[in-house]
Design a protein with these regions (language model features):
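Serine-hydrolase catalytic core recognition
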Residues: 1-225
Length: 225
């Protein structure tokens, strides 16, 4: 169904900078009720990736959209999805900001995870295919060694794909162990990414950390979109 929220200052900022915003409801977003939940049972993120990709393909077909400049941003489960999309569909999602995400469901609390995923013992294959750490090799951003030195006066090239990851070390919902394991896997694979840590930050940044998060994210979008 069609739903929208009242305009706010953030929406206005995107509009003034020529960035189109859309919000996507995947099949388990709530509007499909029990049927939607059944679709994702024991395989979190799998069908959701397909749904987001369908939206990206539609966006890329529009004459006023630059098909190589599709970004995605999310926090918590949205952070998980952002990372998954840039690793599983970097041809459709080129830039992303993933905040406070779960990158291995074995490290999230049981009352949420097992409701949707069953236990790791009963569903090892489901945990594997839903684990962001499994798809690091699909993320294409690597280091370019022939860049010009900034002193040359030339602009540094803008990467065709870039993921930014953030997490608060005080997050008592999604423990930052998730992000530490994720960035370690990216480093082992020689991948290039942005990372911002918020000391003692909770599951959602507040005060000066919230201001920093907002401003840093805006700078990211201005650079890449």
């Amino acid at each position: 169904r069609d739903r929208w929220t009242a305009p706010n200052a953030s929406n206005q900022w995107y509009s003034e900078n020529g960035i189109i915003q859309i919000t996507v409801d995947p099949r388990a977003g709530g509007h499909n009720g029990r049927e939607g939940l059944d679709m994702i049972y024991r395989q979190l993120t799998v069908n959701e990736v397909q749904d987001f990709c369908a939206w990206a393909e539609w966006l890329q077909s529009l004459p006023y959209v630059r098909p190589e400049k599709i970004g995605v941003e999310g926090f918590s489960f949205g952070g998980t999805m952002t990372a998954m999309l840039l690793m599983k569909a970097p041809d459709k999602f080129h830039y992303g900001i993933a905040g406070g995400g779960v990158y291995d469901w074995a490290f999230y609390d049981t009352h949420y995870t097992e409701r949707y995923m069953d236990t790791p013992q009963n569903n090892p294959d489901g945990y594997k295919i839903s684990r962001a750490l499994e798809y690091v090799e699909g993320y294409p951003a690597t280091f370019i060694c022939n860049c010009l030195h900034p002193a040359s006066g030339a602009d540094m090239p803008v990467e065709p794909v870039m993921l930014k990851i953030t997490h608060g070390t005080g997050d008592d919902n999604v423990h930052h162990q998730n992000t530490l394991l994720f960035i370690d896997a990216l480093q082992k694979a020689g991948k290039k990414f942005d990372f911002m840590i918020y000391p003692d930050g909770m599951h959602g940044y507040r005060g000066y950390q919230g201001d920093h998060f907002l401003n840093a994210n805006r700078q990211f979008w201005l650079r890449y979109l």
